[in-house]
UniProtKB/Swiss-Prot annotation:
Residues 17-44 have a biased composition (Basic and acidic residues). Keywords: Ribonucleoprotein, Ribosomal protein. Gene3D superfamilies: Single helix bin. This is Large ribosomal subunit protein bL32. One of its GO terms (biological process) is translation. It comes from Rhodopseudomonas palustris (strain BisA53). GO terms for molecular function: structural constituent of ribosome. Residues 1-60 are annotated as: Disordered. Belongs to the bacterial ribosomal protein bL32 family. One of its GO terms (cellular component) is large ribosomal subunit. The keyword Phosphoprotein does not apply. Residues 1-16 have a biased composition (Basic residues). It comes from the Bacteria.
Amino acid sequence: MAVPRRKTSPSRRGMRRSADAIKKPTYAEDKDSGELRRPHHLDLKTGMYKGRQVLIKKES
């Protein structure tokens, strides 16, 4: 069984755990509608992504 040669310092342990923190989601402002949306996601209100119509909304 593998055993660590040295004790992990609190600093190194904290640096390892820093990736586990919950980060606040980032938002980008849509150039056409001005709405906030997640980066690399399409705008659900208009159905546009990178200037192209991707989603066609149904009339109901």
